[in-house]
């Protein structure tokens, strides 16, 4: 046996992904045709345990495994007796992204990505399988960026994209971020009066939150806004749309995205009491 090759050194432990071994048998400098080669393995299943060389002296077998671990394949010929160990390969479990679940940074809750986003909200993706070394990529960082080493995703704008993780053994897995129903953004330039806040939202083709409940639901999903890197304020009071009665009274309701503290039907719309928090 003068030549030994494996087409790769790692494979997925799914019983399907195969490593192909090629050996060449020669005698007196010439290819040896019809020579029987016996293969053995320490892990997995070989396509055949014995094969005869072709007219060029080559023989190929493939190896699969349903179990993870390292495998050493040996080849031997009968005349003269020769045992030769081939390249060691390793089978890894299939790479996945935690069954499509995310971990919300602000709450620690695990599950599906909420369909209403807090802009600059962050979630952690967790990879399983492969060789344990992962690199993350976003197909559209303007919609959602991802930390290449940790898998932490930052949601930036309303849209859809995919996050891909690649393991050190060259497996890939993809997490799809679907279009949300809406995204809630905070204009952090400062507190403004109600009408200014309303116009800020209209200018970005959004609107003020329809109610205290809409912001409470956002808080329940994402936790306090300042749990995220983008927000450092100790208080982010948000205007909500006036009801018809509010308009008569010149007041509106507010809700704090950090402290909660709902103020219902009592905040003077003429004062710079809250931020323009917009739903788009």
Curated annotation (Swiss-Prot):
<dbReference type="InterPro" id="IPR016187">
    <property type="entry name" value="CTDL_fold"/>
</dbReference>
<dbReference type="InterPro" id="IPR008964">
    <property type="entry name" value="Invasin/intimin_cell_adhesion"/>
</dbReference>
<comment type="function">
    <text>An inverse autotransporter.</text>
</comment>
<dbReference type="InterPro" id="IPR013117">
    <property type="entry name" value="Intimin_C"/>
</dbReference>
<keyword id="KW-0998">Cell outer membrane</keyword>
<feature type="domain" description="BIG2">
    <location>
        <begin position="127"/>
        <end position="173"/>
    </location>
</feature>
<protein>
    <recommendedName>
        <fullName>Intimin</fullName>
    </recommendedName>
</protein>
<feature type="domain" description="Big-1">
    <location>
        <begin position="1"/>
        <end position="92"/>
    </location>
</feature>
<dbReference type="InterPro" id="IPR003344">
    <property type="entry name" value="Big_1_dom"/>
</dbReference>
<keyword id="KW-0472">Membrane</keyword>
<comment type="similarity">
    <text>Belongs to the intimin/invasin family.</text>
</comment>
<dbReference type="Pfam" id="PF07979">
    <property type="entry name" value="Intimin_C"/>
</dbReference>
<feature type="disulfide bond">
    <location>
        <begin position="201"/>
        <end position="278"/>
    </location>
</feature>
<keyword id="KW-1015">Disulfide bond</keyword>
<keyword id="KW-0843">Virulence</keyword>
<dbReference type="InterPro" id="IPR013783">
    <property type="entry name" value="Ig-like_fold"/>
</dbReference>
<dbReference type="Pfam" id="PF02369">
    <property type="entry name" value="Big_1"/>
</dbReference>
<dbReference type="GO" id="GO:0009279">
    <property type="term" value="C:cell outer membrane"/>
</dbReference>
<dbReference type="InterPro" id="IPR003343">
    <property type="entry name" value="Big_2"/>
</dbReference>
<dbReference type="InterPro" id="IPR016186">
    <property type="entry name" value="C-type_lectin-like/link_sf"/>
</dbReference>
<dbReference type="Pfam" id="PF02368">
    <property type="entry name" value="Big_2"/>
</dbReference>
């Amino acid at each position: 046996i003068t030549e030994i090759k494996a087409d790769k050194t790692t494979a997925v432990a799914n019983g399907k992904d195969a490593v192909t071994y090629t050996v060449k048998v020669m005698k007196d400098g010439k290819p040896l045709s019809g020579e029987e080669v016996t293969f053995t393995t320490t892990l997995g299943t070989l396509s055949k345990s014995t094969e005869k060389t072709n007219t060029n002296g080559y023989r190929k077998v493939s190896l699969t495994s349903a179990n993870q671990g390292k495998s050493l394949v040996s080849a031997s010929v009968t005349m003269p007796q020769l045992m030769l160990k081939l390249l060691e390969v390793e089978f890894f479990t299939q790479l996945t992204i935690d069954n499509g679940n995310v971990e919300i940074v602000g709450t620690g809750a695990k599950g599906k990505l909420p369909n209403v986003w807090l802009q600059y909200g962050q979630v952690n993706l967790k990879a399983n399988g492969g060789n344990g070394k992962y690199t993350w990529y976003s197909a559209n960082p303007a919609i959602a960026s991802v930390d290449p080493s940790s898998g932490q995703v930052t949601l930036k704008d309303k849209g859809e994209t995919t996050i891909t993780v690649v393991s050190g053994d060259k497996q890939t897995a993809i997490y799809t971020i679907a279009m949300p129903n809406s995204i809630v953004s905070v204009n952090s330039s400062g507190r403004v009066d109600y009408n200014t806040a309303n116009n800020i939202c209209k200018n970005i083709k959004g609107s003020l939150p329809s109610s205290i409940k809409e912001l409470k639901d956002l808080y329940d999903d994402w936790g306090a806004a300042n749990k995220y890197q983008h927000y450092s304020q100790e208080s982010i009071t948000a205007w909500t749309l006036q009801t018809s009665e509010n308009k008569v009274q010149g007041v509106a309701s507010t809700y704090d995205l950090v402290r909660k503290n709902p103020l219902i039907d009592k905040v003077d719309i003429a004062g710079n009491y809250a931020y323009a928090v917009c739903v788009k």
